[in-house]
């Protein structure tokens, strides 16, 4: 089973697009186990409180494993985990995607309005 790291903006994009995360990820990379960091969860909890919209955080908690890595910033931690474990990162953050590409790490992004796309 492949691991997929979840970035906060990637999760929000999936929720906003109402994408079936399990089916879409399985179509892209096969069976997956979502991986999320404490920093990403904190960002999502702040967003959920500030914007008063459902971000399906219970679903994320139930379906993911909490992981930790090195880095002073959330993006640094995600980048280091992606490289060390060969995990793609679910994100729509342009800066993070650029850093991942430079490091030859894979990205999963929301493509169009209803689909996920793996970029290796």
Language-model segments: which ranges?
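Domain-level signal for Mg2+-assisted phosphodiester chemistry and nucleotide/NA-binding surfaces
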Residues: 1-62
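Nuclease catalytic cores that cleave nucleic-acid phosphodiester bonds
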Residues: 35-120
């Amino acid at each position: 089973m492949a691991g997929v790291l979840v970035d906060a903006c990637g999760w929000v994009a999936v929720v906003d697009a109402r994408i079936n995360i399990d089916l879409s990820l399985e179509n892209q990379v096969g069976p997956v186990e979502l991986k999320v960091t404490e920093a990403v969860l904190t960002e999502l909890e702040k967003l959920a409180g500030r914007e008063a919209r459902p971000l399906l955080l219970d679903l994320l908690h139930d379906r993911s494993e909490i992981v930790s890595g090195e880095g002073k910033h959330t993006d640094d931690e995600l980048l280091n985990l992606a490289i060390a474990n060969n995990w793609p990162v679910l994100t729509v953050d342009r800066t993070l995607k650029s850093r991942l590409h430079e490091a030859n790490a894979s990205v999963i992004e929301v493509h169009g309005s209803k689909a996920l796309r793996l970029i290796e």
